[in-house]
Amino acid sequence: MFARRAIIGFSTGSRAFSTSTMTQQKLRIAVIPEHFSTPIYLAKKHYGLDAELIPEPLGTGALTQRLRSGGDDGVDVAVGLTEGFVADLGKAKAAGKSAGYGLVGTYVETPLCWAISTGAQREDINSVGDLKGGKIGVSRIGSGSFVMPYVLADQQGWLGKDKEPFSTEVIGNFAALRESVRKEGEKPATDGFMWEIFTTKHFYDNGELKRIGEIYTPWPSWMVAARDPKDERLQSMAENINQGVKHYLEHPEEAIEHITGTMHYSREDAQAWMKTVKFLADVRGVDPGVVDNTVSILRKAGVLDERAGGSEHMVAIKRVERANTS
């Protein structure tokens, strides 16, 4: 007997993505322009994903702002990091505000490896321990680069009631973060920062950065969030992304060509990354237990407090197992 994924609605009882047809404009889907977005681009190229794909290099914190925005920067859907979405949703609940979106899908099942980096010429920073009491660069408040240093601090035993383990400085995108740790005649703006390992590796190889450690997320790394979980276009979007994932798995050479042709990755790095990542065959729905575990860890790390609530306020489409006897 095998199991397959079935989707039920969160707030309206038994509900899946609607299968009704709608004559609406294209979905606006924000993605972080890294290698993880490859199946989504393949879905648009080969399977008719009817969406405008909008790159957002500032990370998940910026994605949450786009989901809330009603202006030209607004999006209908965002694909981003679990910790960024959960932290933002929890903080909105703690503040008594509506986040303006909910979690509707799970994109990547494997954890994310965050590289911990400093400038290659920084003789004062040689290990993770050297960051205690220092200044950590982040892309944006609420992004994974902001959340994960606190998870690291918890693991390292740096958290205390009276003193922050480090200070944080909002720097901006990946290029700005790299510049912030370089020592070029003046005191660097930051002592270290965290970014996905394979995105960072090119800059170890070219001598710009120095790797001082790494940390894995203790949860599946990427989720899908939607401004309106009842949007009828989400059903076809999910089906198209599922097709894109299948195509990625069946055509690895095309995936490698996309990664190396549009991003700073060597063929060897792309191949190595592909061995480490597992995309879900069906992106629809989120396991509430995964979200509750993430909330628990973020509370322990001091990112969230008891007012943040749990999955019942965050998961808009649940993912459940159902026996399949066929």
What are these language model-derived features?
Residues 1-22:
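N-terminal mitochondrial targeting presequence
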Residues 23-169, 191-197, 211-212:
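Short, glycine-/small- and polar/acidic-enriched structural segments
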Residues 37, 64, 85, 128, ...:
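Extracytoplasmic/secreted envelope proteins and their assembly/folding machinery
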Residues 70-73, 91, 184, 188, ...:
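Generic structural signal for alpha-helix termini and adjacent loop/cap motifs
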Residues 82, 173-261:
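Pocket-lining segment of extracytoplasmic ligand-binding domains
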Residues 153-154, 204, 260, 299:
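Residue-level preference for well-ordered alpha-helical positions
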Residues 231-305:
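Secondary-structure end/capping motifs
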Residues 299-326:
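Conserved C-terminal helix/tail region of periplasmic/extracytoplasmic solute-binding proteins
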